Amino acid sequence: MLTIFAISDSIAETAHQVTLAVAAQFKEKIKIRRVPYIKTIDEVDCIFPEIAKIERKIIISTIITVDVREYLTKKCYDENIYIMNVLGPIIDSISSMLNTNPEYKPGAMRQIDEIYYKRIEAMEFAMQYDDSKDYGGLKNADVVLIGLSRTSKTPLSMYLANKGIKAINIPLMPEIGVPDEIYTIDKKKIFGLKIDAFQLIEIRKKRLDKFHRISSSIEYAGDERILEELEYSDRIMKRLGCKTIDITQRAIEDTALIILELIGYNKNTNSY
């Protein structure tokens, strides 16, 4: 039986996936052995006694570091072992075309995967706790958005989620109040969304027109009701002592940027 060693200086996920794709093209049984975290020449030497025990073998390598990659290749040639360096030739070709040197960062793909899954997790979080569906996520939230109806809480939550930030949004309504749990979390996480009364009236009227709603429309988009809600939201935000952001005539991206800067977001790692 043929054994393919998938060797990498990171978790060997890329090497493993390439090997699986190749093995799937053959009916014969092929054994795949994953060998991660080979970052030094000494570590290459350490794995060879085990490799030497296998009669029929191939090595598929995604090692990035040049000296380790070249040493592994020479070692294989000396031992008459077939080796395929998956990333090396591609990196060299692109480097030549761009006339620049690559960074040679082991585990770069894993970092990309981690960022991707962090975004997915944040999006699922935002949907689960959207618009006060459940307050159980407050303690796990990176950001808590509070504001009146039609202050862009949901789209802002989703925009932040796309940056890997877990955001929960809570609507402010005089009849309902806010959950007691909100007073127990770090106020630095809480952001109050404020808006000009005239713009809020206009937004709500357009919302009603869009769905042809007549009942209770006067109250929902009426001047007195909106002024009452604005006064209520101001009281809550002052009581919480949270940061406030005026979203009047402000794009969601701009509001998100303010929040990301305030929480110290690092765009390179999707963390803060």
UniProtKB/Swiss-Prot annotation:
Bifunctional serine/threonine kinase and phosphorylase involved in the regulation of the pyruvate, phosphate dikinase (PPDK) by catalyzing its phosphorylation/dephosphorylation. Disulfide bonds: none annotated. One of its GO terms (molecular function) is ADP binding. Its EC number is 2.7.11.32, 2.7.4.27. The keyword Nucleotide-binding applies. It is an enzyme of class 2 (transferase). It comes from Clostridium botulinum (strain Eklund 17B / Type B). Keywords: Kinase, Nucleotide-binding, Serine/threonine-protein kinase, Transferase. It holds the Pfam family Kinase-PPPase. It comes from the Bacteria. ADP binds at residues 147-154. HAMAP family: PDRP (MF_00921). Belongs to the pyruvate, phosphate/water dikinase regulatory protein family. PDRP subfamily. Transmembrane segments: none annotated. It catalyses: N(tele)-phospho-L-histidyl/L-threonyl-[pyruvate, phosphate dikinase] + ADP = N(tele)-phospho-L-histidyl/O-phospho-L-threonyl-[pyruvate, phosphate dikinase] + AMP + H(+); N(tele)-phospho-L-histidyl/O-phospho-L-threonyl-[pyruvate, phosphate dikinase] + phosphate + H(+) = N(tele)-phospho-L-histidyl/L-threonyl-[pyruvate, phosphate dikinase] + diphosphate. This is Putative pyruvate, phosphate dikinase regulatory protein.
